[in-house]
């Protein structure tokens, strides 16, 4: 008999139903469950797949550069970044005739094009790229890296080049190399690029390979470095009248601590950014030499963990046993990595708008909105994944004997307290926030807006004041004009910071009021509830009150009837599934808040947000309905415009989202009946019955149908909001 899919599971390959296909796809990447898997092959497969992942990333970024160089308007945009719309790529086949061709021919293009809202133009411009040739060079280099990565992946699957398990479990060496190599050396290299290429480009000097060795990045060269006069590198920075990309008003400094923003580009000073990366490089180069390897110096991570005894013995045996537990569990390591990456991605969303690093990106409002939303959603998915793998760790890798009375075991021992406290926090936040919103709604409805309950966020305002915001009149720390910190800050460190924080033209420490207080607590509700579901899913993964024997049922067991008290919605997978809905809702509120607050800021009518955000009808009417009006006006006498594609995507997103419910709110019996009926009709229809199948069609399992439903819900949700966000922002600001 010919080998059937899936080859990695003989049991599944012999399944006579369509379950073989779906279960095969579902477990294709669960290497641990494959036939004949060994620990060594598991590590080697994952290692090789990392090279493939890198190849895809390099190919994708290469494609971005290539298409902009080929079909974009980068060189025109560079001449006038504020008024030329950056083109992402051409549209090959604009349907709907001449009106569509005209609507989408913009940005100085000859034919229909897509506008770029990703910020790549601003990024490439800031780091010193100026011509299409530069972009093509970058694309070719990344294509080369992609090929190298593929070869690397193939090479490390060959017997001679396969690393052994001991190599994968050498935590100290890996940490040293990742800290000093990945973070340290790459940050140092980036500082080098900024100092040698980007900063000269911002001052009108074009440095490439042919003149790299002839152009001094600083008039005094390396002299100050070797003589210890490092402060010379900070002297004579660019002036406030500097025109970015020209020598007009430029200085000679390369490493500064100016603080605040370049007045023309509204982005951080490039010399500050270079200084930051140099500092990061030095920190990580030192950190990468801290752990003991072949040379017998430095720390052993195991010794560190074992030595860490909590004071007074109040936390049992502390970190004893953790080293082997973590080092032998890929899921634990992945959980930690995802948790870190999720937090970092959310911080990227926050900092890309509040402290924009790329020239002129702060004035490209649609790009700002798109980047914030994109990074917050990505962060949400990554963070839920962290808890999913945490749960799988408890099921597959956790050994109670190895972890007796250490912090992990104690988390499990008092999980009821953790879960109930989170539950209480969620209930408190939810009922109080909703109560305030609904009270305010009723007051507005009865025509007595003055009876709203409006709470000033005084603690948050105090924190903003401590950082130097003066408008609240708190007169504390950096906002106190006669304090020593204020006076020192004026001259010694970050002189531009206090100016920037009190200017109303940027997004640093936005002024907040009662509307912000309410939506902050709505978001806190979402965060706590999502966390509650995820934490409970992980801590109950091996056993809970209702079903103490989950270990052998695995991560994603389905509903199992009323036996053992019923197993509906109590597998770790069910918790993940439920948490993703809450995560999406929470990030919805986060992005609504960010977008509405910024739209009113950019339009100069902040009072609209301040007055309408204190009651639910305000959000529904003045944010959602008002801003989607361009997307829901249907066919109008003016025919097509450049927002039409977003109107279509808005509709299509709703369709995909609604399709999710077909899978979420129905049961297997219904589908099995439907499938049997369709199969019966097919077999009795002339011509159609010439097509046969070997696998008996069966309905999806409960878990699979939920996954398909969740996927449609998520994709539709994000599609819909993306169309709304881009259309409503670009419709207002071009």
UniProtKB/Swiss-Prot annotation:
The chain crosses the membrane at residues 46-69, 135-158, 175-199, 273-291, 330-353, 369-395, 417-439, 517-535, 575-596, 643-665, 707-727. It catalyses: reduced [plastocyanin] + hnu + oxidized [2Fe-2S]-[ferredoxin] = oxidized [plastocyanin] + reduced [2Fe-2S]-[ferredoxin]. P700 is a chlorophyll a/chlorophyll a' dimer, A0 is one or more chlorophyll a, A1 is one or both phylloquinones and FX is a shared 4Fe-4S iron-sulfur center. The PsaA/B heterodimer binds the P700 chlorophyll special pair and subsequent electron acceptors. PSI consists of a core antenna complex that captures photons, and an electron transfer chain that converts photonic excitation into a charge separation. The eukaryotic PSI reaction center is composed of at least 11 subunits. The keyword Transmembrane applies. This is Photosystem I P700 chlorophyll a apoprotein A2. GO terms for molecular function: 4 iron, 4 sulfur cluster binding; chlorophyll binding; electron transfer activity; magnesium ion binding; oxidoreductase activity. One of its GO terms (cellular component) is photosystem I. It comes from Aethionema cordifolium (Lebanon stonecress). Phylloquinone binds at residue 671. Keywords: 4Fe-4S, Chlorophyll, Chloroplast, Chromophore, Electron transport, Iron, Iron-sulfur, Magnesium, Membrane, Metal-binding, Oxidoreductase, Photosynthesis, Photosystem I, Plastid, Thylakoid, Transmembrane, Transmembrane helix, Transport. PsaA and PsaB bind P700, the primary electron donor of photosystem I (PSI), as well as the electron acceptors A0, A1 and FX. PSI is a plastocyanin-ferredoxin oxidoreductase, converting photonic excitation into a charge separation, which transfers an electron from the donor P700 chlorophyll pair to the spectroscopically characterized acceptors A0, A1, FX, FA and FB in turn. Oxidized P700 is reduced on the lumenal side of the thylakoid membrane by plastocyanin. It is a multi-pass membrane protein.
């Amino acid at each position: 008999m010919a080998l059937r899919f899936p080859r990695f599971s003989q049991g599944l390959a012999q399944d006579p139903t369509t379950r073989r296909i779906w279960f095969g796809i579902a477990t294709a990447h669960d290497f641990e469950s494959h036939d004949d898997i060994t620990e060594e092959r598991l590590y080697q497969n994952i290692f090789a797949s990392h090279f493939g992942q890198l190849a895809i990333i390099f190919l994708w970024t290469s494609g971005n550069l290539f298409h902009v160089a080929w079909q974009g308007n980068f060189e025109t945009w560079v001449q006038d970044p504020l008024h030329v719309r950056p083109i992402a790529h051409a549209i090959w086949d604009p349907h709907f005739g001449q009106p569509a061709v005209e609507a989408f021919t913009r940005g100085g293009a000859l034919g229909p094009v897509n506008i770029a809202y990703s910020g790549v133009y601003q990024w490439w411009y800031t780091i010193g790229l100026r011509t299409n040739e530069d972009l093509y060079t970058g694309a070719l280099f990344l294509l080369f890296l992609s090929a190298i990565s593929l070869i690397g992946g193939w090479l490390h699957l060959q017997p001679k080049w396969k690393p052994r398990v001991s190599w994968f479990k050498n935590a100290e060496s890996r940490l040293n190399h990742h800290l000093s190599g990945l973070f340290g050396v790459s940050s140092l290299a980036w500082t080098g690029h900024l100092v040698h290429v980007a900063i000269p480009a911002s001052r009108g000097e074009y440095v490439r390979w042919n003149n790299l060795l002839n152009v001094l990045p600083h008039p005094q060269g390396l002299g100050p470095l070797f003589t210890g006069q490092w402060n010379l590198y900070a002297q004579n920075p660019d002036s406030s009248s500097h025109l970015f990309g020209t020598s007009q008003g430029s200085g000679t400094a390369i490493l500064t601590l100016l603080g605040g923003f370049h007045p023309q580009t509204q982005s951080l000073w490039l010399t500050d950014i270079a200084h930051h990366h140099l500092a990061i490089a030095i920190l990580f180069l030192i950190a990468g030499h801290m752990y003991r390897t072949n040379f017998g110096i430095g720390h052993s991570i195991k010794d560190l963990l074992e030595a860490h005894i909590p004071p007074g013995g109040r936390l049992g045996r502390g970190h004893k046993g953790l080293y082997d537990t973590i080092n032998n569990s890929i899921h634990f390591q992945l959980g930690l990595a995802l948790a870190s990456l999720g937090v970092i991605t959310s911080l990227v969303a926050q900092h890309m708008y509040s402290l924009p690093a790329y020239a002129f990106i702060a004035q490209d409002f649609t790009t700002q909105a798109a980047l914030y939303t994109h990074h917050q959603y990505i962060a949400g998915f990554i963070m839920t994944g962290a808890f999913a793998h945490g749960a799988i760790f408890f099921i597959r890798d956790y050994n109670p004997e190895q972890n007796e009375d250490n912090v992990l075991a104690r988390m499990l021992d008092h999980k009821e307290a953790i879960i109930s406290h989170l539950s209480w926090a969620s209930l408190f936040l939810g009922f109080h926030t909703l109560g305030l919103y609904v009270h305010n709604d009723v007051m507005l409805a009865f025509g007595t807006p003055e009876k709203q309950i409006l709470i000033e966020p005084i603690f948050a305002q105090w924190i903003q004041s401590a950082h130097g915001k003066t408008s609240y009149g708190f007169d504390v720390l950096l906002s106190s004009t006669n304090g020593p910190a204020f006076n020192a800050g004026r001259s010694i460190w970050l002189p531009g910071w206090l100016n920037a924080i009190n200017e109303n033209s940027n997004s640093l420490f936005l002024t907040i009021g009662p509307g912000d207080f309410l939506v902050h607590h709505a978001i806190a509700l979402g965060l706590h509830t999502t966390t509650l579901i995820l934490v409970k899913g992980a801590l109950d993964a091996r056993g809970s009150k209702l079903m103490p024997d989950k270990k052998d049922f695995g991560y994603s067991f389905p509903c199992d009837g009323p036996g053992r008290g019923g197993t509906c919605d109590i597998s770790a997978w069910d918790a993940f599934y439920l948490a993703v809905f809450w995560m999406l809702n929470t990030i919805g509120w986060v992005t609504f808040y960010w977008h509405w607050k910024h739209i009113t800021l950019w339009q100069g009518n902040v009072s609209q947000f301040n007055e309408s955000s204190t009651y639910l009808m305000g959000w529904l009417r003045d944010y959602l309905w008002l801003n989607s009006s361009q997307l829901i006006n249907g066919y109008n006498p003016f025919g097509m415009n450049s927002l039409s594609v977003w109107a279509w995507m808005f509709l299509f997103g709703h369709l995909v989202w609604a399709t999710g419910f077909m899978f979420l709110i129905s049961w297997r019996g219904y589908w099995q009946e439907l499938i049997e009926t369709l199969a019966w009709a097919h077999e009795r229809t002339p011509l159609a019955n010439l097509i046969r199948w070997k696998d008996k069609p069966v309905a999806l399992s409960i878990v699979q149908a939920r996954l398909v439903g969740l996927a449609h819900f998520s994709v539709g949700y994000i599609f819909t909001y993306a169309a709304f966000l881009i259309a409503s922002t670009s419709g207002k600001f071009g």
